[in-house]
Every structure is written in C-alpha cells, then in structure tokens.
Amino acid sequence: MTNLTLALDAMGGDHGPHVTVPAALRALQLHSFLKIILVGDKTEIDVYLRQAEANLLSRIEIIHTDEVVSMSDRPVHALRTRKNSSMRLAIELVRDDCAQACVSAGNTGALMAMAKVLLKTLPGVDRPALVSCLPAVTQKPVYLLDLGANISCDSETLFQFAVMGSVLCEAVDKKSRPKVALLNVGIEEIKGNDQVQQAAQLLQHTDQINYTGFIEGDEIYSGNVDVIVCDGFVGNITLKTSEGIAKLLVHQLKRGLTQGLFVRFLAKLIAPRIQAVLSQMNPDHYNGASLIGLRGIVVKSHGNADETAYLQAISLAVTEAQRRLPEMIKDRLESILLDINH
C-alpha cells in the first residue's frame, strides 16, 4: 500500500488532544502505511504520547502552535486572524502536498471558510458541499448533501452536488452507478421549487449519473437510493432532526425497558440485541462529514466525538485519500461537460 500522510487538527473539538491523539494512535495501529502529523500545542499532545509504542511514535510528527480556532469564532474572523491556528496549519499541509487529507473536529464554519480559500474548488465546481452518510433499513449507507455549507443553491450547483455525491459513493463504497435522487416535497414531476425542477432537468440529460427522480423525507432511510441531494438549509435541518429523533427513540426505549420487574428481566435477556440496534442508530458510528468539491480532502468530525467516533472520521479520510477522491470528481465533471457540449 502506498504511504499516506494525514494532518490532524489536534486541538479541534470539545476534547482536543484527549480524543484526537489516542484516536490517531489507534489509526496508526490499523494502517501500517499511515503517517500522521499532529498540529497543536506540543506540551498538551505529548501528555497522550508518553505510553505510545516506539513504532507508532516513529510515524507521528508534531507541528507546534498554541493558537486555536474557538467554537465562537465567526468564519470570516477566523480566516483573517487565526493564521497560525492548528486548523489552518493542518489545511495548509494539504494545500502544500505535505499531507493527503486533513481532519478537524473544530468550528465548522471556520473550517469550511479556510478550506475553500486555501484549497480552492475543483474546475467545474462552483461551491464545495458538506456530505455525510446516514443509516438505512437496508443496512447500507445513504449519502446526504449538502449539510449546511450552502444555505441556498441554484440548479447548476445542485447538479454538481449530485455528480460529487455519486462519485463519493463509488469511491468509498465501491458501488457501481449509485442511485441519485433530489430531496423534494413530493415525487411527482410537477412538485418542487424552480431550483429543484431545473436540477432535475439537468440530471435527466446525462447518462453518467443514475438519476432516479425525486424522493420525500419519509424515504430518506429506506435505502432505495444511495445519494440524496438538497441545499444546505434543508440538509442541515434534516440531519439535526434525524439526530434528535434518534436520541428520542433511545430515551423512550431505555425508559420503557426499566418499568416493571418482568420488563426489566426481559430487557436483560435481549440486552445484546438491543445494544446492537442502538449502535446502528448512534450518530458516532457514521462520524465524519466530507467537504467535497475542493482540490484537497477535508473531513469534519463531530465536535463532541469520542475516541472511537474520531477514529471513524480518520478512517474516512484515509479511504478518500486512497481513492484519490478529488481527482475522481474532477475527471467525472470533465467527462459530463464534454458529453453536454457534444
């Protein structure tokens, strides 16, 4: 396997090095070809490296900085003033080809702003999109984009999102011709606003995207499609609502299984199965949102991710780097534009 280097914003997120460094060590154990650059306060990072094995330490580099982008920093402010922050330096390592991807659990708005300015978008891409996968009843992931990078989008941007989401699904899941749908208020062709209607027209006229039509919100988790496209306003609300419902279901299930002696006894008998179901619904299992459409790979972890969840984000970055995702998106867009022009 070709060696890969990842840059980690070690200070990002609610827990900083307490989570990012142990997760990095676990990633190195899993991937013998991997090298990791930890960007952040060396004194804090070293605390979590004291007991690490020598063969793992040999594949770790630390770039020291004591500047951090806070969760309260506005994106423009962070972009202008946090020029030596752990987040920015990690992205710059990707820009300068010192790393093939970067991962951060820090301020989402600042991460998107810095990544777009420092890495630039790919040719044929107007705006990058934030995408993540969701669970489905078929036990295969469903990719949803955009999750908030772009509050409003025109039809051309939605079309580009569909292309990028399709390529991502092919790259990460090795799925041939993934099914792509536009999230809408109905499945009928007459439904939806102008942007969605026009995006549908664009998608219907390219054979390189397996476009299946509109999909409604109640079908998101059906597994009938592989990629669901919408603007960032709709996508972010959809994601947050889904996470809230998952928490509600877990709460109600736990409360229901502790009421009454017989129910508690029954709960103990089926506890392993319940735990397996709850694990599938846990957002940490799907941690890692990709900012796609850029000339480099950037993965956003949940800010409150634990070690296992952060490891999932690292693994996603590794997979995207192995598949050379930006190059795949660039090639597909060029091919589609060539078909349209002919």
Swiss-Prot record:
Question: Lipoprotein among the record's keywords?
Answer: no
InterPro entries in the record = FA_synthesis, Phospholipid_synth_PlsX-like
The set of disulfide-linked cysteines is none
GO CC annotations, alphabetized: cytoplasm
Its pathway is: Lipid metabolism; phospholipid metabolism
**EC number assigned by the record:** 2.3.1.274
| An example molecular function term from Gene Ontology annotations | phosphate:acyl-[acyl carrier protein] acyltransferase activity
Domain of life of the native organism? Bacteria
UniProt keywords, alphabetically = Cytoplasm, Lipid biosynthesis, Lipid metabolism, Phospholipid biosynthesis, Phospholipid metabolism, Transferase
Reactions mediated catalytically: a fatty acyl-[ACP] + phosphate = an acyl phosphate + holo-[ACP]
Q: Name one GO biological process term.
A: phospholipid biosynthetic process
Chief site of localization: cytoplasm
Q: Where in the cell is it found?
A: Cytoplasm
Pfam families named among the record's database cross-references: FA_synthesis
- Any keyword Lipid metabolism? yes
Query: Quaternary state and partners of this protein?
Result: Homodimer. Probably interacts with PlsY.
Entry's family note: Belongs to the PlsX family.
What is the stated purpose of this protein? Answer: Catalyzes the reversible formation of acyl-phosphate (acyl-PO(4)) from acyl-[acyl-carrier-protein] (acyl-ACP). This enzyme utilizes acyl-ACP as fatty acyl donor, but not acyl-CoA.
What name appears for this protein in its UniProt entry? Phosphate acyltransferase
The scientific name of the source species is Shewanella baltica (strain OS223)
Lineage of source species:
Bacteria, Pseudomonadati, Pseudomonadota, Gammaproteobacteria, Alteromonadales
